[in-house]
Amino acid sequence: LVGSEMCIRDRYLGCLLGNYGETVMLAYGGGYIKRNGVYDEIMGILNASGKRVVEFDRIMSNPTYAKAQEGAKLARENHVDLILAVGGGSVSDCCKVISAQAKLDEDIWELENTKHTFPTEFIPLGTIVTVFGTGSEMNNGAVITHEEKKIKGALWGAQADFAFLDPSYTLSVPMKQIISGAFDTLSHAMETYFGKPDENNLSDDISEAVMRSVIRNTRVLLTDPENYDARSE
């Protein structure tokens, strides 16, 4: 986990890329990262590192199982060596499943939900966080919508080898997304806070600190959206 201003530009990403093979799948959502310059910056680093880039875009909020299967097929066909997920929790979740499914000969949904076994091989995954909220970059859980089965549920895929959190990448996130991310973070903290065991005081203390920080810094951002310190918190 690398978190600081300029952490991507200061050659950290380029250095890490040398640990992986030639082909990188660059996965992202809509055109947001192209409008704010993040796409050009990352592509420049990938090209300077001599990587062959396969793009996988239009990952939607609340990613679908069909979209993950589409990505897995693309990864297999192109012999992808690293998946680089750029975005928020939805992009990360989709890529966790892609990473696992691309290495499987069977359907990951049936594997986990019917056979109750879990994948053990993955395409390496890295994340660049541009939208705060879920903390998806820190675990291997993914929330996926299976449209055919009309189920929204959890799958367990890859955990990222590395994650970059540069607060400056969030400076162009609109106010609606700031508020959404704040409430998303609060809801996750409350899950732990109100969950069992009730006597786990350390977890409760951490959750309270997270909630206080989110409330305090969101109030700052409501009046000063480009406040770097509040974004970094």
Predicted regions and their residues:
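Active-site cofactor/substrate anionic-group-binding motifs, chiefly glycine-
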Residues: I42-D57, L74, N78
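Short, small-residue-biased leader/transition segments that mark boundaries at the very start
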Residues: L1-I8
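Short glycine-rich or small-residue beta-strand-to-loop segments that form or flank ligand, phosphate
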Residues: V24-G29, V54-D57, I83-V86
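Carboxylate- and glycine-rich phosphate/diphosphate-binding segment that chelates Mg2+/Mn2+
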Residues: G141-E233
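Short beta->alpha junction loops
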Residues: E55-Y65
